[in-house]
């Protein structure tokens, strides 16, 4: 039984978002639809989810004392992390004191960095992964590359959106790759993972929901990556029945091992009928923004329904759909979007995130489209993006 109070009243049900970006914004909107009181927290003011929250706070979420203070002040019933860069030791302490961390503090801690989740998947669960080594100094980094071999990929153990990642083809790139990885970590310089390159036909995100009525799967989401970040995603990604079954088995093992209720973005490589585990996020996934147009329940609605203890039931997928990101490069604290009217139309939507500023390249929005097939949907989404002019 789920009892929900009314926002801004004594019996209000309160949800605190740790991270208030575009994904958190959609989670906040789903909470608002249920009359839930929303508190958004991030490291900078006027973050997207703060626009649709009842209150907001600006703190360094890696500062355990500051994190504990804001949680103690607001007394949320549900603490919902949106990003990895959080003082997860503090979350475990707070969970031990009776607070509800979504999906659970252990999941946020294990997935905060690539080492925790890789060791769980490969060494504890025995799931197929790429070859890998970890390194915490430049010397051990060279040893790790020698063990894995060329070509390989180096990533900070904690980073997002491709920051700090390099594709290494030769020894001449090692010094630059190490330095770039040290600059790109979400918690500053430190440990890296060196991964062997996996041969694959395509990558998918299998959005997997762990709820009171069991584990549920969305149709697989295909996506194209560039510079470590996604550019387009589409649903459904066509794959063999055997590969889909194996992907679902891997995802089920991972989410049940992590524990708790919520939506998980399980990233997988697919080569023919073979499936290899890549990463998992215990929260909605950026490639899953396509579900805003492709499903009756978006990944955000599913996440909220699951962590509130409600059954998910069946997930209806409407048909071929795609997303394409609006990713301008400029510097401005007063961004405007021109020609949006030419981008939207029947079966085409535009979502602008409301980020307060840009300094370089930043994802500021997404176009969503349906089509007769995924190829057409991707073309329509990309065409919509091309029609939007970002100014500053």
Swiss-Prot record:
Gene Ontology annotations of biological process type: 'de novo' IMP biosynthetic process
Family annotation (PROSITE patterns): ATP_GRASP
Domain ATP-grasp residue range list: 119-308
Reactions the enzyme catalyzes: N(1)-(5-phospho-beta-D-ribosyl)glycinamide + formate + ATP = N(2)-formyl-N(1)-(5-phospho-beta-D-ribosyl)glycinamide + ADP + phosphate + H(+)
Keywords per UniProt: ATP-binding, Ligase, Magnesium, Metal-binding, Nucleotide-binding, Purine biosynthesis
Annotated residues for binding of ATP: 114, 155, 160-165, 195-198, 203
EC code(s) of this entry: 6.3.1.21
Residues that bind Mg(2+): 267, 279
Binding site for N(1)-(5-phospho-beta-D-ribosyl)glycinamide: 22-23, 82, 286, 355, 362-363
One GO cellular component, as annotated: cytosol
GO MF entries: ATP binding; magnesium ion binding; phosphoribosylglycinamide formyltransferase 2 activity; phosphoribosylglycinamide formyltransferase activity
Pathway terms, separated by semicolons: Purine metabolism; IMP biosynthesis via de novo pathway; N(2)-formyl-N(1)-(5-phospho-D-ribosyl)glycinamide from N(1)-(5-phospho-D-ribosyl)glycinamide (formate route): step 1/1
Highest taxon listed in the record's lineage: Bacteria
Complex and partners: Homodimer.
The protein's role, per its UniProt record: Involved in the de novo purine biosynthesis. Catalyzes the transfer of formate to 5-phospho-ribosyl-glycinamide (GAR), producing 5-phospho-ribosyl-N-formylglycinamide (FGAR). Formate is provided by PurU via hydrolysis of 10-formyl-tetrahydrofolate.
Annotated family: Belongs to the PurK/PurT family.
Name the record gives this protein: Formate-dependent phosphoribosylglycinamide formyltransferase
The species this protein was found in: Salmonella typhimurium (strain LT2 / SGSC1412 / ATCC 700720)
């Amino acid at each position: 039984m789920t009892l929900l109070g009314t926002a801004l009243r004594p019996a209000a049900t309160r949800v605190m978002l740790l991270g208030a970006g575009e994904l958190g914004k959609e989670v906040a909107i789903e909470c608002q639809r249920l009359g839930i009181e929303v508190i958004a927290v991030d490291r900078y003011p006027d973050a997207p989810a703060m626009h649709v929250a009842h209150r907001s706070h600006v703190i360094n979420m890696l500062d355990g004392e500051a994190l504990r203070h804001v949680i103690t002040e607001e007394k949320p019933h549900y603490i919902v992390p949106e990003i990895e860069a959080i003082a997860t030791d503090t979350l475990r302490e707070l969970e031990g004191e009776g607070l509800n961390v979504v999906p659970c503090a252990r999941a946020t801690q294990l997935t905060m960095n690539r080492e925790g989740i890789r060791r769980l998947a490969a060494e504890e669960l025995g799931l197929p992964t790429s070859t890998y080594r970890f390194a915490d100094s430049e010397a051990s980094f060279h040893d790790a590359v020698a063990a894995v071999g060329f070509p390989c990929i180096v990533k900070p153990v904690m980073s997002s959106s491709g920051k700090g990642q390099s594709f290494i083809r030769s020894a001449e790139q090692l010094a630059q790759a190490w330095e770039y990885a040290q600059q790109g970590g979400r918690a500053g310089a430190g440990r890296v993972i060196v991964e062997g390159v996996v041969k694959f036909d395509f990558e998918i995100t299998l959005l997997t929901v762990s709820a009171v009525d069991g584990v549920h799967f969305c149709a697989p989401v295909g996506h194209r990556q560039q510079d470590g970040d996604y550019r387009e995603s589409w649903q459904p990604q066509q794959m063999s029945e055997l590969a889909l079954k194996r992907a679902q088995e891997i995802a089920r093992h991972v989410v049940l091992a992590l524990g708790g209720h919520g939506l998980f973005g399980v990233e997988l490589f697919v080569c023919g009928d073979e499936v290899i585990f890549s990463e998992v996020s215990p929260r909605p996934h950026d490639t899953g923004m396509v579900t805003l147009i492709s499903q009756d329940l978006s990944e955000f609605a599913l996440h909220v329904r699951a962590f509130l203890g409600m059954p998910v039931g069946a997930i209806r997928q409407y048909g071929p759909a795609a997303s394409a990101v609006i990713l301008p490069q400029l510097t401005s604290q007063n961004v405007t979007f021109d020609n949006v009217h030419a981008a939207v139309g029947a079966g085409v939507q535009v979502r602008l995130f409301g980020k307060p500023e840009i300094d370089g390249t930043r994802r500021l929005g997404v176009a969503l489209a349906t089509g007769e097939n995924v190829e057409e949907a991707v073309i329509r989404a990309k065409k919509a993006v091309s029609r939007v002019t970002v100014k500053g």
